[in-house]
Amino acid sequence: MRFSDVLDIRNGRNQRQVENENGKYPIYGSGGVMGHADDFICDAETVVIGRKGSINNPIFVDEPFWNVDTAFGLVAHKEVLLPKYLYYFCVNFDFERLNTTVTIPSLTKANLLQIEIRVPDMDIQQNIVSVLDKICYLIELRQKELYNLDQLVKSRFIEMFGNPKSNPNSYPISQLSEHIKFLTSGSRGWAQYCVDNGSEWFITIKNVKDCRISIDNMQPINAPDNAEAKRTKVQEGDLLISITADLGRTGVVTKEIADHGAYINQHLTCIRLNKEILNPMYVAFFMESPAGKEQFESKNQSAVKAGLNFNSINSLRLLVPPLELQNQFAAFVAQTDKSK
């Protein structure tokens, strides 16, 4: 069957005439709730899909709502198609295949109505929905657990070191340059070395976040045997910081990553610290605290395209607590990460 056989598409409309912050009905765009309204277009159990912009982010809405003019409402014919079954189909369908522009991603009603969908008997649909609902519930619980663990670590940082902006423990303050043994940026133009069966990894900015380095979606690479590769190959305990785009994302190289063999790209800088004074994990969390983020914002070298140079990195200032305390915090982080 096609979408045209089993659902209707409700066009969104401009919300200006109905918008009211105290309105009864939510206003949905392709990214989620944008406000509230006094009227609605779509009934409960409708799937929202972007007409422009975010076209691959279906949303299931279980209450009446107003959809804006950049979002479609997919209304299932409930006698043959369960709304939640339609939602899960949309979650797994790549709407980018129907994109009609090369600039802002866009979908047309005509193209959507031609999508083919397998529609089994209602009892089979219900069984599929029940299984997927349970899976999504478990995923949501896990995500909440991970969030709570991250909040626990951030709270522990404040407990141990105090607010880094006010420095209540009067720890000495120094520039990062005083404790750097090695500093370099990553390689550019290495696309030719990126291969699916590569024996090592190429770390990009997407892998570096929240003081960790994720090996998920790591780019395999066969690095060249030259000075450039030797310079950009990471070692255990190296601190990585993003220096373009989303400034100040940090991660610490683990033994697993170092043993596998990994290199950084041009959007990252690699810092090898004097570990007799600074624990890299402590520095990572300090730099991702408000005290660190404010420095990255103030040192941004461009109003158009975010960027940091080596002088900016060297001049970053931080509190230097006793190393024993830093190590205790790093051990707490490691123990918490085992629960993830």
What kind of feature is each model-predicted range?
Residues 2, 66-71, 103-123, 260-269, ...:
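A short glycine-rich beta-alpha junction/loop motif
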Residues 74:
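Extended Lys/Arg-rich polyanion-binding regions
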Residues 14-17, 34-66, 83-85, 94-100, ...:
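Short, ligand-facing micro-motifs at secondary-structure edges
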Residues 4-44, 61-62, 66-69, 174-193, ...:
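Sequence-specific dsDNA recognition surfaces
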Residues 78-82, 273-278:
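Ligand-binding loop in jelly-roll beta-barrel domains
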Residues 1-29, 114-130, 141-187, 315, ...:
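Non-catalytic DNA-recognition/assembly elements of restriction-modification systems
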Residues 102, 223, 228-229, 258, ...:
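A structural connector/turn signal
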